[in-house]
Amino acid sequence: MDPYGSRPSHPDDGALHGILVAFIAVLCLIGCLWAAYRLFLKECLTDCSQHTSSGVVAGPRPAATGPTAVVVHNGAEAQRSSAF
């Protein structure tokens, strides 16, 4: 005998459970997409629109033009930038 009792099952219980699980999954997906938009895409879109509206296109960074220091390692001399 079942100590917790049992209820008669309805034939639509499985379908209702599936619909409920699908609805919750869709809500979670919408929440994840909204969070991704707020965190990443919004910032990327504003950066891209600022670059295209000002006519500035991101290119390679110029090389550092700082003074160099002589580095001696195991008797070999090399020039190394102070930026590193």
Swiss-Prot record:
Q: Where does the sequence pass through the membrane?
A: 15-35
One GO process term, biological-process aspect: transport of virus in host, cell to cell
One GO term describing the cellular component: host cell membrane
Q: Report keywords, A-Z.
A: Host membrane, Membrane, Transmembrane, Transmembrane helix, Transport, Viral movement protein
| Predominant cellular place of this UniProt entry's protein | host cell
Q: Where in the cell is it found?
A: Host membrane
Domain of life where this protein originates:
Viruses
Give the way it sits in the membrane: Single-pass membrane protein
The protein's job, in short, is: Involved in the viral transport within, and between cells.
- Self-association and partners: Interacts with the capsid protein (CP). Part of a MP-CP-viral DNA complex.
Q: What name goes with this protein?
A: Putative movement protein
